[in-house]
């Protein structure tokens, strides 16, 4: 996959993340809004930390880390002529998720989290978080597809 396609994928993911956050902010009048009753609800949270709210006392540091990761990924994307399928998808999803949460950090000083799984005690998250986890799956598939048995 070519560099421009990876960047385009990242922009789509980041845009979708920002759109879902905007929709959640503007359409959630109460603290909790059921999406799928008993399974998923909207619960707006201003998360100043990273995953599981770690480093919440250092939002500026997290902003710098987001910016650095995004810049390194962009430089890496443009330093290569092409990527294999899983690697390209992994990098695209990672950059898109990093930019989505990074934009929140840079603009707002926190990340907008809003998806809550009701049956399990799991941190509230957003589409950028989902994208980063999907990226890890694609990157793992890339590694496993190169292994010879």
Go through each PLM region and give its residues.
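Alpha-helical transmembrane bundles and membrane-interface segments of multipass inner-membrane proteins
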Residues: 1-149
